[in-house]
Amino acid sequence: VAAIFDVSFGAELTVKSYLEHIKGNSPDLVIAQPCPALVNYAEIYRPELLGSFAPADSPMLHTIKMIREFWPRYAGHRVAVLSPCIAKKREFVQTGFGDFNVTMSRLKSCLDERNIRLSTFPEVDYDNPPAERAVLFSSPGGLLRTAERWHPEIKERTRKIEGPRIIYNYLNSLEKLRREKKAPLLVDCLNCELGCNGGTGTDYKNS
């Protein structure tokens, strides 16, 4: 491992891109797009919503592009993403960025099998600058909390929603809400009820 980067910094770039899009283009609806499961659902079942997904890279893609541009010494290195999401692999394939999707649960299994305890190693800093605003991005409502730090007023025009029991029904009704001018400006949505931190690639039930 040549370097370790924190994707929270990329999340700040993602949120900034959202806000610039809202300010510059005045859309009537912006759907958060870091969750590949929701994007894939819209591609298959709700293509009418695709034009409303935020035209911005996910935090992971922002981070990888940042590495390529500002750390050229790693240009030839492959990128392994420590991820809470089994669906992230689809994003790698579709965009051509990212080489390995190493889920947190898989990493934990590998460490346990080899009797490796991370607590026995010294702490080290990330190789990129620390995030200031987006450290909570991967938790439910993290996008909204990050955006509020720049624009507090956006909270009144945002719908925060997560969890497979409700999110897909909501997406199914969203185009109708838009036509009736009842849709929020920003939809902060995730497939997993506990946010990415409790994603399908984590061991959150035993944590």
Where are these regions (language model features)?
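Iron-sulfur-associated redox domains of electron-transfer enzymes in respiratory
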Residues: 1-207
